[in-house]
Design a protein with these regions (language model features):
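Bacterial N-terminal signal peptides that target proteins for export
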Residues: 1-10
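C-terminal motif of bacterial Sec signal peptides marking the signal peptidase cleavage site
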Residues: 19-22
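A residue-level marker of the well-folded mature domains of exported/periplasmic proteins
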Residues: 24-396
Length: 396
């Protein structure tokens, strides 16, 4: 089994180190007829169709009737400039160095980085007038998923598996572990997480579906009954491992979902679902005896949004809940700002913006205790309003 446990690269420079590049200027407006938006993907996504940001950018370009192109690898930003791109988006933090270098040298072209900041030649964070940032708070949903999983486990062991060791992936792994720690603190439990150490900021990553499957099988053998694969298209390996385990208690928290993978419930349907909840949970939940409570806030937060039936069927393994990170609105904003000649900005993808979602629990909803449901609802509301801030070493 080819495993690799690596330390994710953490940008530790403080916000005080941000400086403005004197030679940069805000690029002028670019009419849609002459604009060209482009995705610069890492070598981890040589096929742009497997990169969620590139896919979202292509869709936004189509909606705006603007030309689109993509390229992968460290040389992608420079080649896209030569190709006449007027907006170039680096799709993950591993592209930060090459995007930053190219942006500094081409002030008339707009750039954007997803989940990372621009840097100067020495690697210090820098603010560029032609550089926007997409600030991805996928960690918010991952934190909630960690808390929920801790309340649903029957073995007391959970696991996470990363794919590309970029900031967005690492932040989700860290936040999931934080959510578990929060549950332990609140309930006096000692539920553990395999695959991530939020003291050392090290985790277990995999390059292929086969590696994900091998890691998932290993974690299942160590007692993990809820596994979170954060490996993009390679998540399928975790589904295969769960299916092969043939253990009905082993479930997945699925990732890589967009809004196109969801279905919505009406308020009446959500309330009907709430009425049949048993108030029972897994052995580790520490929940009180079943009781009838007002779960409308929980319904508002989670029950209206579910993973679509056909998506669950395609996954082919039991899915407890899902983490949605949808970049569509953020890409629309980047294109609108570029064509209008607006100043560079920071574009949020978060619970509050609607770009980050923890889905409902489907058939597992009756197994959530009233205490767990209301706790999740309360935390989600606090996160959206800023009362609870989920921070990781990998934040922009």
């Amino acid at each position: 089994m080819n495993k690799r446990t690596i330390a994710a690269v953490v940008a530790t420079t403080t916000a005080a180190a941000l400086v403005t590049s004197a030679c940069s200027q805000t690029p002028s407006a670019t009419p849609a007829a002459t604009a060209k938006v482009c995705a610069a993907t890492s070598d981890a996504h040589p096929d742009p169709a497997t990169d969620p940001v590139a896919t979202a950018l292509a869709g936004a370009a189509d909606r705006a009737s603007i030309a689109y192109e993509s390229a992968s690898g460290e040389g992608a930003p420079a080649s896209l400039v030569a190709s006449g791109c007027t907006l170039i988006v680096g799709t993950d933090s591993t592209m930060a160095s090459s995007i930053s270098e190219t942006a500094r040298a081409n002030s008339a072209v707009r750039f954007a980085l997803v989940g990372a900041s621009f840097t100067d030649a020495k690697g210090a964070r820098v603010s560029l007038k032609n550089g926007s940032i997409v600030d991805v708070d996928a960690s918010q949903a991952a934190y909630l998923a960690g808390y929920a999983s801790a309340g649903m486990t029957t073995t007391g062991t959970l696991a996470v598996i990363g794919g590309t060791a970029d900031n967005v992936t690492s932040s989700q792994m860290d936040a999931f572990a934080q959510g578990v720690d929060s549950y332990n603190l609140a309930n006096g439990t000692s539920i553990s997480v395999l695959g991530w150490n939020n003291v050392t900021n090290q985790g277990t990553f995999a390059d292929s579906a086969e590696q994900v499957q091998s890691l998932a099988a290993d974690f299942i053998s160590q007692g993990a009954d809820i596994i979170v694969p954060l490996a993009g298209e390679n998540n399928v390996g975790a589904a295969r491992a769960v299916t092969a385990a043939a253990n009905p208690l082993v479930r997945l928290v699925w990732s890589g979902l967009t809004k196109a993978d969801l279905k919505g419930l009406t308020r009446d349907e959500a309330e009907s679902t709430d009425e049949v909840m048993s108030g029972q949970s897994g052995a580790q939940s520490g929940a009180p005896a079943a009781q009838q409570v007002d779960t409308q806030s929980f319904a508002d937060a989670f029950s209206y949004i579910q993973i679509a039936d056909d998506v669950r069927a395609e996954i082919g393994a039991p899915v407890l809940t899902g983490i949605v990170v949808d970049y569509s609105a953020a890409m629309d904003t980047l294109i609108a700002e570029a064509t209008a000649g607006s100043p560079a900005s920071t574009v949020p993808v978060s619970l509050a913006s609607g770009g980050v979602i923890l889905t409902g629990f489907g058939a597992y909803t009756p197994m959530l205790s009233s205490e767990l449901k209301l706790g999740l609802s309360d935390m989600a509301g606090q996160i959206e309003t800023g009362g609870l801030v989920i921070s990781t070493p990998f934040d922009v």
